[in-house]
Amino acid sequence: MVTRERAENRDGPKMLKPLVEKRRRDRINRSLEELRLLLLERTRDQNLRNPKLEKAEILEFAVGYLRERSRVEPPGVPRSPGQDAEALASCYLSGFRECLLRLAAFAHDASPAARSQLFSALHGYRRPKPPRPEAVDPGLPAPRPPLDPASPILGPALHQRPPVHQGPPSPRLAWSPSHCSSRAGDSGAPAPLTGLLPPPPPPYRQDGAPKAPSLPPPAFWRPWP
């Protein structure tokens, strides 16, 4: 039993080593395939269309592409927003073009009319898009256009004035210390305040009903004294 267990333990690493090696090769192949597609989108080199391209050639293309990019754009130099926008637009067009090429390989079975309609609609997305308007903060009120005085809405409102009330002045507004002092200075005596202050309120009973003020008895005409 002990000899059998030792034999299985010795065969374990031998069985795992080929599996690990296979996984490592699969990872390398996947990364190289992705690198080939990325270089094809950026460089548009027809040699990169071959899916069976040698691994060494893919790596040489990658080194040449990085060397060219570092020569055009030195490291450490900040990029402007315009350059970033151009790079994004170029990336978008390259990827879209690659998708169209892949779609064309599957569109041969469709009818010519359907294929033409599909590609004409897809090619519309390759046109440059107009710049977007500036974003407006939804929390801020929308700007109002300036009003023209000659407009039919604003013109009559400017020329028409509200009617001025010609009634007697309010007692509170008519009486003021300066007004009383000016009147007293003109006549030499203090001006009476009759008519300038509001009349006192009528007396109220305890039950809440107002008490009528006492009036003198009515005068009757008599022929005798």
UniProtKB/Swiss-Prot annotation:
Region: Disordered; residue ranges are 124-225
Q: Which UniProt keywords apply?
A: Developmental protein, DNA-binding, Nucleus, Repressor, Transcription, Transcription regulation
Q: Where is this motif: WRPW motif?
A: 221-224
Database matches in InterPro entries: bHLH_dom (IPR011598), HES_HEY (IPR050370), HLH_DNA-bd_sf (IPR036638), Orange_dom (IPR003650)
Q: Which domain of life is it from?
A: Eukaryota
Decide whether keyword Electron transport is in the record.
no
Spans of biased composition, class Pro residues? 140-149, 213-225
A cellular component term, taken from the record's GO annotations: nucleoplasm
Alphabetically, the GO molecular function entries are: DNA-binding transcription repressor activity, RNA polymerase II-specific; protein dimerization activity; RNA polymerase II transcription regulatory region sequence-specific DNA binding
Sorted alphabetically, the Gene Ontology BP terms of this entry are: negative regulation of DNA-templated transcription; negative regulation of transcription by RNA polymerase II; Notch signaling pathway; post-anal tail morphogenesis; rhythmic process; skeletal system development; somitogenesis
Q: Which residues form the bHLH domain?
A: 12-69
Result when mutating residue 22 to R = Loss of repressor activity
Reply yes or no: does the keyword Nucleus apply.
yes
Residue ranges occupied by any Orange domain in the UniProt entry: 92-122
Q: Which Pfam families match?
A: HLH
Subcellular localization, per the record?
Nucleus
Q: What induces or represses expression of this protein, per its UniProt record? A: By Notch-signaling.
What is said about its interaction partners and assembly?
Answer: Transcription repression requires formation of a complex with a corepressor protein of the Groucho/TLE family.
Q: What does this protein do?
A: Transcriptional repressor. Represses transcription from both N box- and E box-containing promoters. May with HES1, cooperatively regulate somite formation in the presomitic mesoderm (PSM). May function as a segmentation clock, which is essential for coordinated somite segmentation.
- Copy the domain comment: Has a particular type of basic domain which includes a helix-interrupting proline.
**This protein's name:** Transcription factor HES-7
- Which species? Mus musculus (Mouse)
Name of encoding gene: Hes7
